[in-house]
């Protein structure tokens, strides 16, 4: 078969650019349709007396310089954005990826990794060398983010290269495409963390580049060993790229499936090949088997056999199991989530998603219609007598790739989210954008090519408007009730998952509750933009002008606004929050960093805290216990325990010594005599077991309280109070207050953040000391607080507030205070 019937309607008299491959007539080799690059010819100049020497192209306008400039500018943007990153923010996603790299450097963080899900390993391989050259964990994290930037900066370069080499787009227009597709908001924002999003964004473009290289290699019909080697090389690399995508994250099975189906669709419907079949499918099979072995090994050593439920998270097996086990009464979640995903696609692209859908689907349909006409001899002919198709076969292949990969990721993401355990509690579940938006630029690119080639009519613009209107109507009918809920549950929002639509919420913060009004505002903005496109298209029809700049430049500006808005409102804020969360853990563990004791147990800490503890102190062995029962079930005594202050573990054991109370936030406990003796040798002040105590210097208070030496001085109307704490069992407890004028205090003892009062009895009050007792009836009483308020006209001083448990037994794992 030849490509004679598949030429684009381009100027046949234009000269190919320097470095272009072949000519229009040479693009018809079996399996190929790689067109040369053409510039629009300049108007003929009047004849001169002597022919002018050809003008040499400026190096600053050459393709290689523009690609270099795109890379440098993009990298500079990524580097600047990296300056606000500090520490893990999205856990366990980031931590799990980093921990795999740490494992290959000799660190075993399995005790903390196994508490979270499996998220893939391929991107972790790029982080392995960081541990060779950088010792400081904080710097390690930032270098990893810089690696993300180095990788992602290739995206606009690949987009430019494909636009120029494959589709013959002019230089300036190719730059516009590179900015829109290669600097897409998701590419800039989601790559500022050490999760797997970087390669999820980049690998589709690597695969597209290999498509071009493979099609180009088919032009060599000599069947020489060199030609065959090239064809098999590109095919094998493409297959391995698909497997690498799946090894990066489970959802990328969508790209693997799309790549395989693409080869078959092109073979059966176009009678062509994208890749050499043997090399492509062999590499997919071999790579998939290798991935299964590597994944199994890492899941075994890091996610542990006894945590198999966690190791299976984010795998296709887990998703299929959840789908087949779905509650029949909850099947409505699938159409709700599917429509929500379409809503996100259209909205986050400021309406261009609807245009892309219309152009890709109509482009494929018209390609086959005009192709069939050409076979029957009824097609329009070019000046040299060759039949024209609506779009070239190469563009049709890319449209198929975009259509298949978008369809596959929608299926996978809907499967993940419609069966999610947080469907009823998270407002972002049905409109979850993070999984799908990494592929949006792949769909935008062929649509821009078609607009550039004049394949965007008034009917296309109207169809996009109608499509968006239909999707939005279904959104209001199906998705909005699922997102907003019935009012009985306050649904939370994880902003990172829906960043693309946050600028359209108009006046609402990133974490504000999503309401019906939120949807109305987003829909109104997008429909107004699509209506503007229709109007502009009607005007340009009369003037016979192109729509490319009218669409690309405003869309690029709006997408840049999305990036800036989300960077300022989310990335910067989360960088500060991550740093704040790591400070307390760091301060606590720095107290014992040089002790020689490396066995630390994190009790009932949130994942964002214990993963930071392990990452910031990589040589320590951090293990977990979320409840007293699990703490008692430990087979060995840790050297130290870190816990949230409100847990007050020293109340529950007679052999735990409180080493430090870090900013009323984190408690550090010594668990063995050896650890306790080391603390004493270092001059660290230890609190007695089975109690906790505030001094007048550190007890929390209202603003009017002053400090005098070791006492808190309370003027009339002021108060001191304990932080909220938990009581993990029933029994008797005693508060001992010391100071002057204590009998003038109004005492309030409450639980559940002041919702309930706890009865108490003052058993003694003399000589500057007051003792009150109370009983906890429940097995667990949360958010208990003692508040002392001065209601009299005279000042009251408080020097200490101490709580003790009346009856204390050692923890099972701490049977004797003589333990080493």
What spans do the regions from the language model cover?
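Membrane-proximal lumenal/periplasmic loop motifs of glycosylation machinery
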Residues: 82-92, 105-128, 142-145, 149-150
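Short acidic/glycine- and proline-prone juxtamembrane loop motifs at membrane-interface regions
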Residues: 92, 116, 189-200, 251
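Transmembrane-helix motifs of polytopic, lipid-linked glycan transferases
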Residues: 146-168, 206
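Transmembrane-helix signature of polytopic, membrane-embedded enzymes
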Residues: 159-183, 201-202, 229
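Membrane-interface alpha helices of multi-pass inner-membrane proteins
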Residues: 178, 228-249, 260-263, 281-288
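Perimembrane helix-loop-helix junctions
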Residues: 215-217, 221, 254-285, 357-381, ...
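Membrane-lumen/periplasm interface segments of specific transmembrane helices
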Residues: 268, 275-372, 401-416, 470-486
């Amino acid at each position: 078969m030849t490509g004679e019937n598949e030429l684009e309607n381009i100027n046949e008299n234009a000269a190919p650019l320097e470095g272009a491959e072949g000519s229009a007539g040479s693009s018809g080799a079996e399996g190929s349709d790689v067109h040369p690059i053409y510039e629009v010819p300049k108007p003929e100049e009047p004849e001169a007396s002597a022919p002018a020497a050809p003008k040499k192209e400026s190096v600053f306008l050459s393709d290689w310089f523009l690609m270099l400039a795109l890379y440098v500018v993009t990298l500079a943007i990524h580097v600047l954005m990296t300056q606000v990153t500090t520490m893990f923010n999205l856990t366990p996603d980031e931590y799990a990826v980093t921990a795999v790299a740490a494992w290959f450097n000799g660190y075993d963080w399995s005790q903390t990794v196994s508490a979270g899900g499996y998220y893939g390993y391929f991107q972790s391989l790029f982080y392995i060398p960081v541990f060779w050259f950088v010792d400081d964990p904080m710097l390690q994290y930032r270098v990893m983010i810089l690696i993300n930037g180095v990788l992602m900066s290739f995206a606009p370069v690949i987009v430019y290269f494909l636009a120029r080499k494959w589709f013959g787009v002019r230089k300036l227009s190719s730059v516009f495409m590179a900015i829109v597709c290669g600097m897409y908001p998701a590419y800039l924002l989601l790559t500022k963390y050490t999760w797997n999003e970087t390669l999820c964004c980049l690998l589709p473009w690597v695969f597209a580049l290999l498509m071009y290289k493979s099609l180009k290699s088919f032009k060599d019909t000599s069947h020489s060993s060199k030609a065959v080697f090239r064809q098999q090389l590109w095919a094998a690399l493409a297959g391995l790229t698909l497997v690498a995508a799946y090894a990066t994250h489970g959802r990328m099975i969508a790209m693997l499936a799309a790549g395989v189906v693409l080869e078959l669709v092109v073979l059966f419907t176009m009678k062509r090949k994208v890749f050499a079949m043997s090399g492509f499918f062999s590499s997919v099979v071999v790579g998939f088997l290798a991935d299964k072995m590597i994944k199994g090994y890492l899941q075994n050593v890091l996610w542990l056999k006894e945590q198999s439920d966690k190791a299976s998270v984010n795998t296709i097996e887990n998703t299929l199991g959840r789908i087949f086990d779905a509650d029949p009464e909850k099947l409505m979640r699938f159409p709700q989530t599917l429509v929500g995903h379409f809503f996100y696609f259209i909205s986050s692209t400021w309406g261009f998603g609807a245009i892309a859908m219309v152009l890709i689907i109509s482009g494929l349909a018209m390609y086959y219609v005009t192709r069939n006409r050409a076979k029957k001899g009824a097609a329009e002919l070019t000046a040299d007598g060759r039949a024209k198709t609506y779009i070239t076969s190469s563009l049709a292949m890319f449209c198929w790739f975009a259509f298949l990969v978008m369809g596959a990721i929608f299926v996978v993401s809907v499967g993940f989210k419609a069966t999610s355990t947080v469907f009823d509690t998270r407002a972002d579940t049905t409109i979850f954008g993070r999984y799908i938006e990494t592929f949006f630029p792949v769909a935008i690119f062929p649509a821009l090519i078609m607009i550039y080639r004049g394949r965007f009519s008034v009917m296309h613009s109207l169809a996009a408007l109608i499509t968006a209107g239909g999707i939005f109507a279904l959104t209001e009918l199906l998705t909005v009730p699922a997102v907003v809920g019935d009012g009985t549950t306050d649904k939370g929002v994880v902003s990172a998952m829906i960043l693309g639509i946050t600028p359209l919420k108009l006046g609402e913060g990133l974490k504000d509750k999503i309401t019906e009004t939120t949807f109305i505002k987003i829909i109104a903005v997008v429909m107004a933009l699509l209506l503007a496109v229709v109007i502009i298209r009607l005007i340009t029809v009369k003037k016979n002008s192109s729509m490319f700049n009218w669409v690309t430049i405003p869309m690029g500006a709006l997408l840049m606004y999305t990036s800036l808005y989300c960077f300022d409102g989310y990335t910067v804020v989360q960088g500060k929050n991550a740093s704040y969360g790591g400070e307390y853990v760091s301060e606590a563990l720095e107290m014992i960093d040089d002790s020689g004791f490396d066995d630390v147990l994190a009790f009932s800490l949130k994942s964002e805290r214990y993963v930071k503890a392990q990452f910031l102190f990589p040589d320590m062995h951090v293990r977990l216990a979320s409840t007293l029962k699990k703490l008692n079930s430990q087979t060995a005594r840790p050297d130290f325990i870190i816990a949230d202050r409100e847990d007050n573990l020293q109340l529950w054991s007679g052999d735990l010594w409180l080493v430090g109370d870090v900013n009323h936030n984190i408690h550090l406990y010594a668990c063995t005599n050896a650890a306790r003796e080391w603390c004493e040798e270092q001059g660290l002040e230890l609190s007695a077991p089975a109690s906790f105590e505030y001094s007048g210097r550190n007890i929390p208070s209202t603003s009017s309280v002053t400090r005098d030496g070791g006492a808190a001085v309370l003027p009339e109307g002021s108060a001191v109070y304990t932080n909220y704490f938990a009581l993990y069992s029933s029994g008797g407890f005693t508060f001992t207050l010391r100071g002057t004028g204590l009998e003038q205090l109004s005492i309030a003892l409450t639980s559940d953040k002041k919702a309930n009062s706890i009865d108490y009895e003052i058993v003694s009050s003399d000589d500057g000391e007051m003792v009150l007792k109370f009983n906890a009836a429940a097995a667990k009483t949360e958010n208990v607080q003692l508040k002392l308020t001065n209601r009299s006209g005279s000042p009251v001083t408080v020097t200490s507030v101490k709580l003790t448990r009346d009856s204390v037994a050692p923890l099972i794992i701490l049977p004797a205070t003589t333990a080493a």
